[in-house]
């Protein structure tokens, strides 16, 4: 992919992704070995619940696969009225490859009966998954102890601490550093929160919608043995208290905002912002004068030195596919060092462990030059919880709501967690009653 094309692609690609072990090998997975019938024309259908724009579909899927496998024709099956995945299953028209978002999709597709263990395909095609980040690979598993692999990660999201250099310069405070913990950032936020020249500046903000569901302590929401909520715990109290205190700083509580990103990106009134990938909107912000940089996401002083759990996009080869080998070759190529490097260069963190690929992160994004963007891919992601269930997305939504009641409405943490547990259990029962 030439540099001009990469630059054109990165903005559209970054917007798209923000709205979403076999062996012990080397840097990246070995691609599927060529088969005897490699030149036999075949059509592979692909389903993405969020749908691709024509531009992204052609650039992220069609062109790289056509270049590698000219005999393979890809068809994008759109998620529309009458062609939802459930509709396609009912009509016996399940696509060959299905894309999904994290463990939620694994549970959903498993319930639809369309998943199949991919390890035989991996073995038959000489695919070595040893170069894939094991945390990302495990994040798609219903049971980490199960050797079966139903989906492979193709992309992942992390988070970092972005900061406004101009504000730190203005108030004579030292910049944040890599490797800080939340206690240190809290003290820094207190120094930065103030009113100056009639303008109210906040020291810190974060996006609870990511920080809570993908929490750094790998806390479970629901007990997978009982299907009962498990959030009245010391761990959840620690997370709520650690993040809520930032909103107790005088002048640092904005209340519920219609857009939590604008104060940092546009208004330039937030000194530090802990958030997943915002490199795409930072293009415009940089053009409008925002002098920013980033450091690694702060960690808990008494806990593991990990970032948030990775927000993983997975690829699944359906059980009913009549062209499993060719479908798998498509998946394997998208996980290759070549494609993962191209995507890393336009700002998508690679699912491969290879240091050279990590170092290439955002290299083709001109507005990142001279900035510490390697921090975004330098931390260690938190593993998924020991207990995962199909109800975790429901529970995560309720926990975010309760955290905001604590942060913005002054609700007691113990009360909020008790109420969350009651609501989650009620919603689990409602889901079960639908069966």
Q: Which residues make up each language-model segment?
A:
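Conserved N-terminal structural module of periplasmic/extracytoplasmic solute-binding proteins
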Residues: 2-112, 127-129, 175, 254, ...
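Aromatic-glycine-rich donor-binding/catalytic loop that engages nucleotide-sugar donors
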Residues: 166-177
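Glycine-centered hinge/linker elements that transmit conformational signals in sensory
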Residues: 188-189, 226-256
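Extracytoplasmic/periplasmic substrate-binding proteins
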Residues: 47, 208-212, 241-326
């Amino acid at each position: 992919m030439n540099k001009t094309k990469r630059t054109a692609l990165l903005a559209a690609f970054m917007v798209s992704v923000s709205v979403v072990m076999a062996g012990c090998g080397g840097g990246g997975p070995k691609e599927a070995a060529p088969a005897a019938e490699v030149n036999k024309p075949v059509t592979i259908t692909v389903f993405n619940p969020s749908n691709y724009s024509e531009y992204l579909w052609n650039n992220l899927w069609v062109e790289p696969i056509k270049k590698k496998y000219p005999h393979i024709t890809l068809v994008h099956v759109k998620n529309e009225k009458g062609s939802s995945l459930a509709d396609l299953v009912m009509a016996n028209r399940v696509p060959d490859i299905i894309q999904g978002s994290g463990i939620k999709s694994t549970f959903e597709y498993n319930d639809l009966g369309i998943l199949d263990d991919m390890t035989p395909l991996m073995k038959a095609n000489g695919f070595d998954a040893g170069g894939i980040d094991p945390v990302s690979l495990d994040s798609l598993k219903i049971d980490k102890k199960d050797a079966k692999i139903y989906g492979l990660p193709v992309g992942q999201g992390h988070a970092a601490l972005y900061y406004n250099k101009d504000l730190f310069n203005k108030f004579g405070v030292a910049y944040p550093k890599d490797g800080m913990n939340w206690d240190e950032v809290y003290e820094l936020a207190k120094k930065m929160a103030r009113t100056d020249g009639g303008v109210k500046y906040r020291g810190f903000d974060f996006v609870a919608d990511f920080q809570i569901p993908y929490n750094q302590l790998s806390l479970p929401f629901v007990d997978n043995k009982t299907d009962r909520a498990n959030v009245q715990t010391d761990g959840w109290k620690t997370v709520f208290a650690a993040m809520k205190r930032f909103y107790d700083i005088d002048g640092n509580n904005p209340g519920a905002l219609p857009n939590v990103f604008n104060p940092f990106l546009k208004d330039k009134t937030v000194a530090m912002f802990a958030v997943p990938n915002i490199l795409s909107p930072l293009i415009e912000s940089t053009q409008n004068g925002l002098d920013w940089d980033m450091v690694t996401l702060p960690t808990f002083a008494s806990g593991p030195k990990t970032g948030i759990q990775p927000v993983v996009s997975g690829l699944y080869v359906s059980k009913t596919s009549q062209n499993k080998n060719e479908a798998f070759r498509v998946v394997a190529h998208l996980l290759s060092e070549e494609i993962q490097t191209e995507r890393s260069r336009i700002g998508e963190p690679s699912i491969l462990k290879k240091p050279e690929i990590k170092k290439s992160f955002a290299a083709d994004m001109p507005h990142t030059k001279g900035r510490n963007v390697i921090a975004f891919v330098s931390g260690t992601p938190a593993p998924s919880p020991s207990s995962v269930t199909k109800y975790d997305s429901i529970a995560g939504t309720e926990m975010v709501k309760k955290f905001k009641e604590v942060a913005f409405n002054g609700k007691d943490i113990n009360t909020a967690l008790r109420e969350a547990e009651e609501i989650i259990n009620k919603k689990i029962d409602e889901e079960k009653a639908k069966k």
